[in-house]
């Protein structure tokens, strides 16, 4: 689907957002098929998109696990699907995290087990939680670290290259054949990982496993914030819920 039409549809989805997409994180057993938990929601969502159906009842009826601790949730699925389309990637190649560093650690662990060289390049500053010495001395991860100005400065590497950038707009990616993984971080929102190239497809299940077992997807509120900025849509609902949660805590 052409980018502008897709974003117009996403904007309409946000305007008709089911309240459960923000509030409900337990199983909807009446519409949940565990065997298709990772694919069923997006398959049905794409049908609605193609027919430009953003009716609240249609969105509410989409089958999903509604469990961001394990498999992702409706808004993380929509965010990942949107970013994948904007960057001409398969939706499974885009994975969101509440953490800024979990995706990086998942890749480093896989490389340690496989004995693969790793180059981490970054623009600006690394995430505060990224402790180079701890990763090397305690976890035994091996990697080269290099600061660059942009993706054009990333050179070919005998191994795998992770590109980290901190920015407000998590969807902005300048693709390069010299980069295997893009990690877009935002201290207030989390991070988004983009897996580049068919040769890296095998990493996806391992990274999803880490998110499922050790962390969570970007939260519903933060996904809504990101999608709202992307589509120039206000999201008072997200702000209201966030402030209410802070009060309860």
Per-range role (PLM):
Residues 2-105, 109-249:
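Conserved N-terminal alpha-helix of the aminotransferase class I/II PLP-enzyme fold
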């Amino acid at each position: 689907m052409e980018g502008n039409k897709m974003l117009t549809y996403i904007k309409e989805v946000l305007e008709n957002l089911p309240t459960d997409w923000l509030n409900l994180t337990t199983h909807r057993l009446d519409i949940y098929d565990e065997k298709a938990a990772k694919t069923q929601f997006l398959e049905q969502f794409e049908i609605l998109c193609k027919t430009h159906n953003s009716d609240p009842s249609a969105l509410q009826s989409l089958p999903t696990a509604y469990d961001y601790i394990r498999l992702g949730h409706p808004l993380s699925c929509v965010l990942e699907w949107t970013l994948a389309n904007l960057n001409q990637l398969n939706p499974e190649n885009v994975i969101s995290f509440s953490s800024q560093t979990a995706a990086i650690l998942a890749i480093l662990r896989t490389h340690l087990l496989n004995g693969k060289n790793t180059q981490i390049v970054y623009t600006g500053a690394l995430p505060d939680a990224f402790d180079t010495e701890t990763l090397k001395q305690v976890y035994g991860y091996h990697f080269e670290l290099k600061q660059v100005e942009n993706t054009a400065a990333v050179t070919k590497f005998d191994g795998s290259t992770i590109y980290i950038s901190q920015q407000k707009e998590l969807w902005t990616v300048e693709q390069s054949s010299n980069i295997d993984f893009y990690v877009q971080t935002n201290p207030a929102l989390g991070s988004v990982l983009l897996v580049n190239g068919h040769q890296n497809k095998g990493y996806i299940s391992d990274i999803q496993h880490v998110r499922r077992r050790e962390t969570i997807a970007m939260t519903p509120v933060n996904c809504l914030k990101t999608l709202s900025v992307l589509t120039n849509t206000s999201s008072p609902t997200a702000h209201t819920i966030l402030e209410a949660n802070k009060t309860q805590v």
